[in-house]
Amino acid sequence: MDLIRKNYAELVQRMGRTIAVQITNDLFTRNILSMGEMEEILSCKVAQDLTRELLNVILKKGTESCTRLLQSLENQDPFFYEDLIGQRVQSGVTEEDLENLADHLKRLYQYPFFKKFNPLGEDTDIDIIFDLDRTFTDPLLWRKGTLNRREKQLTLSEMLEQLESPCVIEGEAGKGKTTILKRIAMLWASEKCRALADFKLVFFVTLRGASEGLYETLSDQLFPITYSWNKKEFLNKIWHLGRKVLFLLDGYDEFQSESCTEIEELIKNNPKFNSTVIVSTRTETIGKLRRCGALIAETSDFSLDNAKQLIANVLEEDEANGLLFQLEESSFMQNLMKTPLFVVIACALRMGESDFQMNTQTTLFSTLYDLMVEKKKYKIRHLSANILAANIRKFGDLALDGLFEQRFDFNEKHLSKIKEEVLLNIGLLNKYTAQRRKAVYRYFHTTFQEYIAGRRLSQLLSSEDNSDVTKGEDFLNKIVSVFDITTKYKNLLLYTCGSSKVATQKVVKHVAEVHKHDKNNYSTELVEFGLNLFFESSTKKELSQDFETLFSEKCLYINSHNISSHHIEFFLYLPNCLSALQLIKLDLSGTFATVPSESTMDRDSKSAQSSVCDNYIPEKAVKLFFDWNQSIQTLEVTLRDFHQLNKKDIKYLGKICCSADSLRLNIKRSSGITGSLVGVLESCKNIQDLNVDSTKLSIEDERRIVQMTEMKTLSILNLHSEHLQGGLLEGLCNLVGLEKLVFHNIKIDKNDAKTLAEGILSLKKLKRLSISHISNIGDGMESIAESISLCCHELKELKLIDCCLSAKALRSLGQSLYSLSHIEILDLSGNYLLEEGKESVEELAANLTHLDAIRTLMLPGGTDVKFCLEAVLPTLRRIPTLSELAFKRWNLTNDDLMTLASYINSGFENLSFLDLSDNCAQSAGWLSLTAILQYLPNLTYVNFSTEDLFTPDPDLVRKLVRAISALPLLHTMELNNWQLDDFDLAQIKKAKNMIHR
């Protein structure tokens, strides 16, 4: 007993955990220790604590128990026992001893025990193991200077080649610091790293488990049980080796420096020992090491490739593919995966554990949160559960207040009611002191602050305490626009709904109420947000009626390449919301690759077939729309860049389209449709609208189109093939239910135009007609204009743009305006009248008073139309509904603009769009017009572009800047051909931040 008391301190320092555990087990088998005593001793995490507890228990039991302990020590560690009783004949540490130790360490660093680790921490109950051989990805590090700024990016190899001691590896939680140090040890053990070849010994030390001295720590963590040297001799030998010894010290942020001053000295007074040191630490403790660090390297973010490599190496193929797909479809996930810990947690959630299903962002953060609190409980075990819970609540309030104040940096004042040690020790908060007078605190990830805030808001909204509920609702009421809902507070609301069904119900109700009173139309953004909100809430069908208010009479866009779990669950669990949607847009895209030539297909049919197969409509799109029993109001399907379409595609398309009551079909740049459109139209009998763009049609296609007598809309765009006799134009008369007809940039001649005119005679229900960018049709427009005048009395929108409109055709239209009284939009721009233009425009203007509802008037240009300006303007002034007006290519001069200005200053207050482009005025004319802009307060668009290059006077620019700055709604101003210098542009951008083109 006296021997133990006399050598108590040395026993505590030198025994080590391994020997202490073996002695404890031995004494239990000899019935000296009870089961309870053994469990109490072994529960100690730190080696010295375990040894101290063992000695205290034995000393209380008396002399016989002490004798048994010494006997056990003699059996387990005879060298230490002989040292203790003074019988050991000391021998020096030989070169052979060091060689044997080096061999032992190299074997240790190659053992599974060292290479395999639990990425979620040894203190968790989750049995997931990673292997460094498979999971390590080459990290990037930032070299930092004295001012704590990133100076240069380094690979691990480059850092080792430039190594200076002590080297500090800095990084936030989960950034892979431990992995880097272990990798260095493994590289040394492999003897394949040139930068590490000169090191005779490499010691990897976990500072959290450090003993009361450096030698004791090495003995406890690394030495073989057969070592036969004493502390003084060994350390002297190590110090003589100098820079040839590398210490890898992991986790300075968890190091109790007062318990092991030797290691603290080794780091901070490194020149005294002359050994090489690499130490890792978290950001909040970097301030303790910056002064002594010769090289400070900060761990960089994971690249997307790093994340993908880790996922592929860790998971089984099916599990990896699922997570990789989720990573591809979510920019949010890509951002999170920059932090290795998030990749690890995402992998853990995919590993088939029943408690870990990777469904939502909330799941990821909730798992991380629980792990951090559970893993670091040992650091705060001295605090009661009530104190911990209170600080966690205040921590949530801090996050919530910060979000609504747009604050992500906090100071000591903000943490005045919180125990700082709780949050720092758990790892929920990071502390930054480098190059700062006052410490700054941040959540270790911005999105993590949003999660903590959402978690807290969810607790408030679902609380049984009315004061908490009121507090939560007060936060919700601060969100007053759809824009804020879908941008600034998007993640906050997602995490709120991901944490509670009750909170979800209240959030959905609030969002619907905000949208109801928001004057701006953000319907598309709101639907996308609602989709994410539903998925995050994991409520399935429970709140289907609540969600219906978010989707009613709105539009949902889906791209076939980005069909996600959100869409699948939405279709599966919320069919009532699908039916409530006014429109669903489905974009089916083929490949953009060049279609193989016939010769290539003959030479390599397999390759060609593979290329073609890439164009197939994906099965997941079919399953999404076909596997349910509700009905969509309107479905708009776009086939884009399909270079091949086979029977399977047509069948799939039919299955998709049959789910809707009404179908819109858009075909763009799809050569594979040519000749196959017949089959498509046969399988999609509910087509109401058909739009064909840059896709050639066969005669069979055209004939099938004109048989679709129930069709409401037909648009043919950018078709440069010759007109096929007996096709579309000849059969147009069959489409008697047509309400909208568009021909844009198609190839037709004079005779084709007359055929088109004959077809228009039958379209008595037509409400919108657009013929644009068509040339070489001679006087064919006269026939078309006559047909419009005779039969299209229901027209609301008439656009005849750049289509060879003649004065005669214009006069025909003008004379019939009394029968076209429903027209709201009349666009005749892009046409240039050569003869009798003045008279025809005058006649048109005189009859505009018959158009009670006209809002848009784009007049044609011409050689002499400017001479009717004074006759036209009084008529236009008498049209109160006019909001858009164009005098493009009117050859207006300074005098003409002055005339225009004299009329526009009164009676045109509702004008929002004014196009005066391609005219001939100079500064004086533009000055007169600029002066009256103040009388047009509703202007949103102005075009003052000139036909020729124009250098404005400085006074014009100054007054124009003043004028546009006073127009609150103006967002676009075109000044093409104005020669503006940098000073001019700077002033214009300062006034409205608009770009000169």
From Swiss-Prot:
- Boundaries of every CARD domain copy: 1-88
Region (Nucleotide-binding domain (NBD)), start-end ranges:
95-300
Looking up InterPro entries in the UniProt record yields: CARD, DEATH-like_dom_sf, Leu-rich_rpt_Cys-con_subtyp, LRR_dom_sf, NACHT_NTPase, NLRC4, Nlrc4-like_WHD, NLRC4_HD
Q: List the disulfide bonds.
A: none
Which superkingdom heads the taxonomic lineage of this protein's source? Eukaryota
- Keyword field contains Transport: no
Q: Where in the cell is it found?
A: Cytoplasm, Cytosol
Binding positions for ATP per the UniProt entry: 171-178
Keyword field = Apoptosis, ATP-binding, Cytoplasm, Immunity, Inflammatory response, Innate immunity, Leucine-rich repeat, Nucleotide-binding, Repeat
Which ranges does the UniProt record give for the LRR repeats?
550-570, 629-652, 708-731, 735-758, 760-785, 797-820, 821-843, 851-875, 884-905, 908-935, 937-958, 972-994
Give the NACHT domain ranges: 165-478
GO biological process terms held by the UniProt record: apoptotic process; inflammatory response; innate immune response; regulation of apoptotic process
List, alphabetically, the Gene3D superfamilies matched. 1.10.1900.50, Death Domain, Fas, P-loop containing nucleotide triphosphate hydrolases, Ribonuclease Inhibitor
**What is a single cellular component term in the Gene Ontology annotation?**
cytosol
Q: Which Gene Ontology MF annotations are present? A: ATP binding
Task: Cite the residue spans of the region called Winged-helix domain (WHD).
Answer: 358-465
Entry-linked CDD domains: CARD
Tell me, in a sentence or two, what this protein's role is: Key component of inflammasomes that indirectly senses specific proteins from pathogenic bacteria and fungi and responds by assembling an inflammasome complex that promotes caspase-1 activation, cytokine production and macrophage pyroptosis.
Protein name (record):
NLR family CARD domain-containing protein 4
What species is given as this protein's source?
A: Xenopus tropicalis
Gene responsible for this protein: nlrc4
